[in-house]
């Protein structure tokens, strides 16, 4: 489903974000990516969705190159990829419902979504998504009146409304307390198991990675240094991922 072929990313100042990455991700996997801050985890996810261009190599999504896609082709590929960010990326002054409905924007011309011309079916999808994350009672609440955990669950409902094949979650629990973090991860696991969505999540917490990941990818200094089943991954492997390098930060925040 997702193929990275000899992918490298070098920033303008010479910092290496990714170095010769080769990776295959199959449909329906729940993958956690771990490593020090600056190791290349966020660069990896942002490259898959082409939020940034790679310097070398190719990224294939369902047989189509997102690296070279343009215009309509690029929009169609991205429509199948949902993003969840550490900072939630909600419109704070808008209602929860309006934020969740933005998951449908990839299906319409810009002018329709600008004027909030969503269909009754879209609104029903949004409401059902909020039910799945236990926030149906917050439909008309402004996003900035919610707790951090609730805002992240709104972001998950938005992704569910989008109905993508792939979810890329970039440190989705970094700013949350342990209990709320676990709830957010349970919601992501629900999307994976019940809807068949492929999930790739960057995590700082090794504990959460062990609890929810089926496969773990270790990243250090822009390179994949480990790739294996979680059930076969020892604590010593995690220790090596985090301590085996010099830990220098690159030009990214995770």
Curated annotation (Swiss-Prot):
ATP binds at residues 35-42. Part of the ABC transporter complex PhnCDE involved in phosphonates import. Responsible for energy coupling to the transport system. It is found in: Cell membrane. It is a peripheral membrane protein. The complex is composed of two ATP-binding proteins (PhnC), two transmembrane proteins (PhnE) and a solute-binding protein (PhnD). This is Phosphonates import ATP-binding protein PhnC. It catalyses: phosphonate(out) + ATP + H2O = phosphonate(in) + ADP + phosphate + H(+). GO terms for cellular component: plasma membrane. GO terms for molecular function: ABC-type phosphonate transporter activity; ATP binding; ATP hydrolysis activity. CDD domains: ABC_PhnC_transporter (cd03256). It comes from the Bacteria. The keyword Translocase applies. Its main location: membrane. It holds the Pfam family ABC_tran. InterPro entries: AAA+_ATPase (IPR003593), ABC_transporter-like_ATP-bd (IPR003439), ABC_transporter-like_CS (IPR017871), ABC_transpr_PhnC (IPR012693), MetN_ABC_transporter-like (IPR050086), P-loop_NTPase (IPR027417). The gene is phnC.
